[in-house]
């Protein structure tokens, strides 16, 4: 007797978070960190990567995600912590210079890489830098909109807030959306990928 149907197929989603809309290998990008040093996602290969998108002037949700990531970092076993790389990428490169990101990360005890571009202002290289960052946002399904622009410092940003967990090969395996996620369940997803 022959049965029709599928045997095997993709494995079930075993995570507390969601399956990414844009899955597969993560886009390998290079930006500058809060120490004005080049930082490449490729350098994190071999570790589980927690990757989010924030901005320092954000009054609420970005602070909540940073605090949750810090909780996860502080509550991982020491041997597990060595196998995880936390990373934050700005959605406000006009304000979030490396100096601003340094102050933000230091004041919150969030010493992982906080990334931006060298210059996102008007003109030559700065437009290319902004375009590169915009491409990164697109590859990670980050929507961003500026409004209320009165001058260079008086504007608001609204953005989606995905936090990805990438496996050791830098494949996007799980995403947590928004800021109201449970850090304990998030930590379980990180630990699952550490043990995988």
Where are these predicted regions, by residue range?
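Secretory targeting signatures
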Residues: 1-12
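N-terminal "domain-start" segment that seeds a small globular fold
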Residues: 11-42
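Short loop/turn microsegments at loop-to-beta-strand junctions
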Residues: 26-27, 48-49, 160-162
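Short active-site neighborhood of thiol/selenol oxidoreductases, capturing the structured segment around
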Residues: 39-69
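Sec/Tat-exported extracytoplasmic proteins
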Residues: 48, 55, 73-80, 108, ...
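Structural microenvironment flanking redox-active thiols in thiol-disulfide oxidoreductases
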Residues: 66-134
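Thiol-/selenol-based redox modules, centered on thioredoxin-like
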Residues: 138-139, 143-196
């Amino acid at each position: 007797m022959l049965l029709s149907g599928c045997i095997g197929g993709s494995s079930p989603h075993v995570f507390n978070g969601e399956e990414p809309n844009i899955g597969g290998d993560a886009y390998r990008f290079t930006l500058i960190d809060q120490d004005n040093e080049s930082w490449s996602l490729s350098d994190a290969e071999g570790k589980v990567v927690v990757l989010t998108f924030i901005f320092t002037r954000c009054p609420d949700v970005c602070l909540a995600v940073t605090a949750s990531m810090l909780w996860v970092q502080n509550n991982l076993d020491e041997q597990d912590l060595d196998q995880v790389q936390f990373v934050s990428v700005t959605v406000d490169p006009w304000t979030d210079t490396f100096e601003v990101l340094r102050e933000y990360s230091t004041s919150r005890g969030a010493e992982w890489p906080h990334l931006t571009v060298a210059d996102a202002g008007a003109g030559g290289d700065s437009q290319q830098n902004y375009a590169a960052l915009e491409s990164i946002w697109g590859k990670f399904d980050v929507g961003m909109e500026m409004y209320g622009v009165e001058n260079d410092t008086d504007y608001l940003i609204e953005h989606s807030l995905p936090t990805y967990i990438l496996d050791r090969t830098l494949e996007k395996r799980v995403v947590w959306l928004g800021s109201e996620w449970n850090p304990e369940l998030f930590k379980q997803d990180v630990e699952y990928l550490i043990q995988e």
